[in-house]
Amino acid sequence: GGQEYGLRSGTLPLPLVVGFAKAIEIAVLNQKNNAEKLLFYRNNLLEGLLKNNSGLLINGSIEKRLPHNLNLTVLDLNGAKFHKLLKSKIICSTGSACSNGEPSHVLLALGRSLKEAESSIRLSIGLSTNSKDIKQAIHILTNTIKSLR
């Protein structure tokens, strides 16, 4: 048939549609609790990093952001070495999920220098993240920062 103006012909698989609807229902029911959990762990990560390290700048608003991410600039270190050392120890990124390895144009637009943008890191918290993960991340990041300064 020519359903969907010829874009998606064929009958929709009803079991998949029902399953998708149930998944959405569960996600919506858990959305508030999940956001609170992510925010709790993100704030613990930030507090631990700020407590143990000087020269950290928060990129973007800490209030107006999704609860699962944190983007920081680490001053006074070589960004390339920083990322290389972290690569084997912690899952993190130097930019957005769609970046091409270049310094973030968003960080540059926020007023970060090229050097600051190159020594920035994006950390994400997942639903499976726990307190042990946060403590380990703080430990790894702190030791890596101290080794490069």
Q: Where are the language model's segments positioned?
A:
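Predominant activation on well-ordered alpha-helical scaffold segments within soluble catalytic domains
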Residues: L14-E25, L46, L50, H83, ...
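PLP-dependent enzyme catalytic core of the Aspartate aminotransferase-like
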Residues: H105-R149
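Conserved C-terminal alpha-helix-loop-beta "cap" of PLP-dependent enzymes
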Residues: L70-I121
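Conserved PLP-dependent catalytic core of the aminotransferase class-I/II
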Residues: V28-H83
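Active-site PLP-lysine loop of aminotransferase-like
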Residues: G1-T11, S96
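Localized chelating/binding microdomains
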Residues: L7, I26, N30, K64, ...
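Amphipathic alpha-helix from the class-I
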Residues: T11-N33, L50-L56, S128
